[in-house]
Amino acid sequence: MAATPAFRGSFTALVTPFKNGSLDEEAFRKLVNWQIAEGTTGLVPVGTTGESPTLSHDEHHKVVEWCVEEAKGRVPVIAGAGSNSTTEAVELAKHAEKAGADAVLVVTPYYNKPTQEGMYLHFKAINDAIGIPIIIYNIPPRSVVDMSVDTMSRLYELQNIVGVKDATANLGRVSQQRHAMGPDFIQLSGEDMTALAYMAAGGHGCISVVSNVAPKACSDLMAAVFKGDYAGALKIQDRLVPLHDAVFKEPGVSGAKHGLTLLGRIQEEVRLPLIPVSAPTGQAIRSAMIHAGLLN
């Protein structure tokens, strides 16, 4: 396990803005700066929310480079480097390290359903290829496989494995992983709705989709938790619950992009097979943003 930067607080799983079918570099760089100004404590480009499945390798590389350049060391950048091909994941991780990312986020291999040993060897190959921290992304609903606590514990013995983004929706895993790996194993919630409860059980932060739209509120919630002000955090959560619901009525990427479009920060474009949100979902997002104090 490597020495790690301060991977705690509110991390935004950044959307990737498009304009006329191409990457919108200007909008992306402005989004990075706005996120930091609003209090976001870390950035995660080219994950699922960044539409990594529909980016070319060249586009993937560019977005990581732009994020690192624009962040200028003000907050850590955890670059998405996941694939169900170990060779491809190694290549993406090597590029992220070369670009100056502080860490990589690597999803458990999806669709091809590896065994626990296959997952271990996949992450070990990435560990052996780079020298920056690796955060496991465990998301059984999308990957179909669930990395066991035992496999995670074995991986934590390696030099660069430092933590997990946990989207199991099983709050018991926080305590089980803390017991197995200890309090220094970084645990980041991957579920906006349950992030507050995750933190109360021993989490270190959240990699959030909703913080694309509500970065200050998400950051303030984490800050309240770190101060032990759970009553204050709950008040913020009460404002955000309708937005958590609305953004995920359809794929969260489309929901987050719709919210950012309402704020005038990006164009709503997504790439097929994703499509923009329907009119009823769009109205639900608008209403939730008004409830959260993000729109008048």
From Swiss-Prot:
Pathway(s) annotated for this protein in UniProt: Amino-acid biosynthesis; L-lysine biosynthesis via DAP pathway; (S)-tetrahydrodipicolinate from L-aspartate: step 3/4
Statement: the UniProt record of this protein carries the keyword Lyase: yes
Binding site for pyruvate: 49, 207
MF GO annotations: 4-hydroxy-tetrahydrodipicolinate synthase activity
GO biological process, one term: lysine biosynthetic process via diaminopimelate
Catalysis performed (reactions): L-aspartate 4-semialdehyde + pyruvate = (2S,4S)-4-hydroxy-2,3,4,5-tetrahydrodipicolinate + H2O + H(+)
A Pfam family hit: DHDPS
Major subcellular site: cytoplasm
EC identifiers of the protein: 4.3.3.7
Source superkingdom: Bacteria
Location of this chain's protein in the cell: Cytoplasm
GO cellular component annotations of the record: cytosol
Top EC class, one word: lyase
Annotated site (Part of a proton relay during catalysis): 48, 111
Active site: 137 (proton donor/acceptor), 165 (schiff-base intermediate with substrate)
Keyword annotations from UniProtKB, A to Z: Amino-acid biosynthesis, Cytoplasm, Diaminopimelate biosynthesis, Lyase, Lysine biosynthesis, Schiff base
Alphabetical list of PROSITE patterns matching this protein: DHDPS_1, DHDPS_2
Homology family: Belongs to the DapA family.
Function: Catalyzes the condensation of (S)-aspartate-beta-semialdehyde [(S)-ASA] and pyruvate to 4-hydroxy-tetrahydrodipicolinate (HTPA).
Assembly mode: Homotetramer; dimer of dimers.
Protein name as it appears in the record: 4-hydroxy-tetrahydrodipicolinate synthase
Organism field: Rhodopseudomonas palustris (strain BisA53)
Name of the gene encoding the protein in the UniProt record: dapA
